[in-house]
């Protein structure tokens, strides 16, 4: 049996990370899966296996064990805003969002991603896939206002660091994430947030996860960055040829 590449997915207990970890495990003829989560609860949530490591991406030393001997990295960590306590929907208005101490986008999406990219370089990783978000071309995007976190600004900074790192990469800037079935839509790639002006600016998490897995399999996905959206289910032929999808992408950032 050939030596299979070992793939580490970070943020493996998150909503999209869980799907990627599961797909890697199911693809055991192609990959050896490893996961990185922040807590023991996160580890239990995805099955508690020995291939799941616990570490804090904002603390470089704590994540090093997970990076030993890996060939590829899929980054699915992200700062997550929490609704400020005390919001009463019956009174109208909008809820306020805050980030917990130590979990601001600057720490998680910039320093945390930089730590992962650096650890991957030391490990000799041959490919890094990162899932980001559409909207990064607009500094005034509403997502940047959440908790005054400037989340897209910091994600973009980490993406630029990755693109400049010398390690082959794929940057997937997903549209609005849907908790819907994967594999039943035509997927669309774009650049510079053009898809945000269309009705194809959302994409199921399961499809984002599949694109992460497929990116590991095709040279055509390397050193490219793209936005990812989808056509509504039932309106066109579901994407099956990922080599062709990646071949449409010409942008390096």
Curated annotation (Swiss-Prot):
The modification N-acetylalanine is found at residue 2. Keywords: Acetylation. One of its GO terms (molecular function) is oxidoreductase activity. GO terms for biological process: response to abscisic acid. Gene3D superfamilies: NAD(P)-binding Rossmann-like Domain (3.40.50.720). One of its GO terms (cellular component) is plasma membrane. Homodimer. Belongs to the NAD(P)-dependent epimerase/dehydratase family. This is Uncharacterized protein At5g02240. The lineage of its organism: Eukaryota, Viridiplantae, Streptophyta, Embryophyta, Tracheophyta.
């Amino acid at each position: 049996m050939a030596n299979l590449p070992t793939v580490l997915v970070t943020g493996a207990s998150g909503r999209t990370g869980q799907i990627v970890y599961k797909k890697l495990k199911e693809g055991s003829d192609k990959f050896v899966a490893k996961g990185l989560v922040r807590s023991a609860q996160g580890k239990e949530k995805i099955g508690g296996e020995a291939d799941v490591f616990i570490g804090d991406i904002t603390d470089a030393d704590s994540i090093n064990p997970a990076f030993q001997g890996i060939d590829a990295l899929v980054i699915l960590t992200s700062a997550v805003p929490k609704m400020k306590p005390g919001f009463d929907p019956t009174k109208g208005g909008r809820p306020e969002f805050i980030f917990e101490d130590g979990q601001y986008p600057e720490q998680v999406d910039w320093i945390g991603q930089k730590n992962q990219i650096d650890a991957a370089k030391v490990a000799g990783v041959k490919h890094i896939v990162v899932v980001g978000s559409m909207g990064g071309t607009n500094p005034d995007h509403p997502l940047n206002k959440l908790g005054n976190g400037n989340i897209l600004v910091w994600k973009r900074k980490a993406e630029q660091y990755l693109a400049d790192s010398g390690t082959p990469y794929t940057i997937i800037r997903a549209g609005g994430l849907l908790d819907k079935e994967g594999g039943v839509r035509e997927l669309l790639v774009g650049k510079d947030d053009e898809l945000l002006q269309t009705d194809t600016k959302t994409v199921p998490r399961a499809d984002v996860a599949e694109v992460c897995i497929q990116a590991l399999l095709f040279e055509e996905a390397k050193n490219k960055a793209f936005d990812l959206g989808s056509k509504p289910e039932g309106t066109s032929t579901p994407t099956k040829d990922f080599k062709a999808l990646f071949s449409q992408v010409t942008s390096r950032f």
